[in-house]
């Protein structure tokens, strides 16, 4: 079974660190609008990986993304130690958190079973 991963704001160097296997398809969105359009056309995505620095209002924009995804889609936010985010409220929304820098081990732990 093929797993689809959609990224927003994640550069190629970081994607290479994730060690994404051959059974996965990687889709990259350059803007939040492009990500929204991919989801609006009904593209089934298993995991969405978003960089917190790519969002102007992370909580609000993540809520928009949540509204466009199926219940089985995992949303992962890469955040940084100096971000001023309410991590608990993001967890309550069902957002998984992955602190930068990205590592293959951290990614694998979050995406097991996807």
Feature locations, PLM:
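Conserved acidic segment of CheY-like receiver
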Residues: 2-12, 19, 48
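Output/docking surface of receiver
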Residues: 30, 76-114
């Amino acid at each position: 079974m093929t797993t689809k991963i959609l990224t927003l704001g994640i550069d190629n160097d970081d994607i290479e660190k994730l060690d994404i296997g051959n059974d996965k398809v990687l889709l990259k969105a350059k803007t939040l609008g492009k990500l929204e359009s991919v989801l609006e056309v009904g593209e089934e995505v298993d995991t969405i990986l978003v960089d917190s620095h790519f969002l102007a209002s992370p909580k609000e924009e993540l809520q928009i993304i949540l509204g466009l995804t199926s219940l089985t889609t995992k949303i992962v936010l890469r955040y940084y130690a100096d971000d001023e985010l309410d991590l608990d409220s993001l967890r309550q929304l069902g957002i998984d958190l992955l602190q930068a820098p990205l590592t293959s081990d951290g990614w694998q732990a979050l995406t097991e079973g996807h």
